[in-house]
Amino acid sequence: MPPNPTPPRRATTTTTRATSGVRRGEEEQGGMAVSASAGEEEEAFEEVDPTGRFGRYADVLGLGSVKKVYRGFDQEEGIEVAWNRVRLRALADRDPAMVERLHAEVRLLRSLHHEHIIGFHKVWLDRDAGVLNFITEVCTSGSLREYRDRHRHVSVKALKKWARQILLGLDHLHTHDPCIIHRDLNCSNVFINGNTGQVKIGDLGLAAIVDKTHVAHTILGTPEFMAPELYTETYTESVDIYSYGMCVLEMVTREMPYAECDSVVQIYHSVTRGVPPAALKRIRDPELRAFIERCIGQPRNRPSAAELLRDPFFAGIDDDDSTGTLG
């Protein structure tokens, strides 16, 4: 459940502005901030981090199951960031295990450096408020699901570029030492910068770090995107390939997999019996359909992310010629 939409908490210190420590109309010599010109309104921060580098604005970028994400600003680099804020006390009362999963996400983000995985900047704990804060890279256009809903007419070429970038991020996770299984890959956990088309994987709160056997045992995820073996509690990183196939299906159709099901129970029965989503039958492009079917096949037949990157499906995606449009 997302947190209650209560007004954002003010910092215990005085509200700070982007030009903190600099008088209006003056420039800090050798500093990191420049004031707005006289007569311009400055946007106030709701709070700043302990170092004074990062500021949080009031507007919310997104609500997750365990956190609220605000628009933030890095005064040192002059870039916008995502300020992730989690109320640990309320979270611990509702689900103590979630606290550890959140800490796991932070630890993972700190160890991962890849152009197609959301970047991490800083983390700190506000003990008085019982809030964990962490600063991450922000993607200007939100999740891939939101972006696809806003832009209904997208070329197959563009879709392939997005799909390939997701695979590059997955390959980095799966070849990480130790291997990392995302376990909750879906289009709401993939983010995009619309002005560049760059795609990044985020929300690693349910990810699992596994040993050399590459086997995990916990049932977690989003039902519409969960591989059947996830329900058996014994699985490998190939569950991410299944979820990836469902992501591609959603990108193509703009429809959640198994939208025809009325409940999680119905989804479970369809998935475990090998019944594909109804949306798959509506894909007319045989190449697209075959690619998705390859991803959501039996675990032993699913290719790795590295193998999929070599699939003919991605041949020529950097060519200038468009290859058709999805409406």
Curated annotation (Swiss-Prot):
Source organism's superkingdom? Eukaryota
Which PROSITE patterns does its entry note? Answer: PROTEIN_KINASE_DOM (PS50011)
Residue stretches of biased makeup (Acidic residues):
39-48
Name a GO CC annotation attached to this entry. cytoplasm
Q: Which SUPFAM superfamilies match?
A: Protein kinase-like (PK-like) (SSF56112)
Q: Where in the sequence does UniProt note compositional bias of the Low complexity kind?
A: 9-19
Q: What is this protein called?
A: Probable serine/threonine-protein kinase WNK5
Native species of this protein?
Answer: Oryza sativa subsp. japonica
Gene name tied to this protein: WNK5
